[in-house]
Swiss-Prot record:
Enzyme Commission code: 6.1.1.15
Keyword Cell inner membrane: no
Protein name according to UniProt: Proline--tRNA ligase
Organism for this UniProt entry: Rhizobium meliloti (strain 1021) (Ensifer meliloti)
Lineage of producing organism: Bacteria, Pseudomonadati, Pseudomonadota, Alphaproteobacteria, Hyphomicrobiales
Coiled coil start-end: none
Single GO MF annotation: proline-tRNA ligase activity
Similarity section: Belongs to the class-II aminoacyl-tRNA synthetase family. ProS type 2 subfamily.
Main location: cytoplasm
Pfam family, one: tRNA-synt_2b
CDD domains cross-referenced by the UniProt entry: ProRS_anticodon_short, ProRS_core_prok
Reactions it catalyzes: tRNA(Pro) + L-proline + ATP = L-prolyl-tRNA(Pro) + AMP + diphosphate
Amino acid sequence: MRLSRFFMPILKENPKEAEIVSHRLMLRTGMVRQQSAGIYTWLPLGKRVLDKVNAIIREEQNRSGAIELLMPTLQSAELWQESGRYDAYGKEMLRIKDRQDRPMLYGPTNEEMITDIFRSYVKSYRNLPLNLYHIQLKFRDEIRPRFGTMRSREFLMKDAYSFDLDRAGAEHAYNKMFAAYLRTFDRMGLRAIPMRADTGPIGGNLSHEFIILADTGESEVFCHKDFLGFDIPGEDTNFDDVAGLKTIFDKWTSRYAATSEMHDEAAFGAIAEGERLSARGIEVGHIFYFGTKYSEAMGAKVLGPDGKEHTVHMGSYGIGPTRLVPAIIEASHDDNGIIWPKGIAPFDVVVINMKTGDEACDAACGKVYSDLGKAGFDVLLDDTDERAGGKFATADLIGVPVQVIVGPRSIANGEVEVKDRKTGARETMTVEAAINKLVAAR
């Protein structure tokens, strides 16, 4: 992508309405634009990041055996009345009526709808286990939306729902998602710590929040430092291995970890002082096992191997991509801008032409741009007429992991400069060497 043809409306000044770093940087870089309170348009730069986040989520959900579908944003009130949650849910649920005066709602969550889909088609234990997921917009009418897309009214969610014959099967489904979430966040450059959580309005008796540490986090968290060194489940993880996944779950829940809402000061105090970690954190995922809460209320049953009807056991598993993007920024930035982890950066490499219009610079930039593109890189070529200092500032601000800097002096010697955005390390080498180095490191 040539920057001269890309839509990236960068703000020169920090927006006054932004309270936290991620909100400020997302507005400044032109990732998002606020349309009204808590409602945002994702502009091209932000959409590229969001798409890469969603791609990783999909890959790990599919790897774990979950199957994607897509449910609508509007739901019938009848399903919620059947489950008993229509009146119990607060004012954050947007209730509307269609032209036939039928009560509808803009879905804040999807337990009722997915249970209705399941009971309509699945009648036998032979069709279990089953895990269905979708990535869809939701709406919750927050009293005070704030922090940009971190806490907005309309937001994107990945919701997965598992169905099993009994609790043992449901716990295995829970452990699958537990391991999948660890892998998902790790691939985005995050160390997410699972913490026992309150089940809230979703219900159930087993729940974990996945928290990343960030100075501006909304929650105060307390945990053992061992979490910072635990191994992440590998790409070869066998999601059908009941014992293996239980081992992963047991390891990651063997140390103390809690947010302030669930904190036990006595249990935390029993940890050696040097092994305690107290910090701020941001929730990036939440998983629940809620047993038969919805299936019992809505008659979701299957015939078991004994020929009798069994009410299925369910779980739900959520990740908010539009919340995850600012959370990553909160955890990975410096005074100059965003530092994107490689897997989710809007572009893999930015080629900076310090003197657009110079024949040698244009030719070298064109070669790097073309060759890296053919090798599968997402490349941004800054071919604008902006001064060099402004180009460097823009590259740092938007956080592309690698910068290839092409200037008249260096290219006269057949060389370019390669800069690592995260470390600031710079290396001068030939054009061919730079291309080969980046391709080899991919």
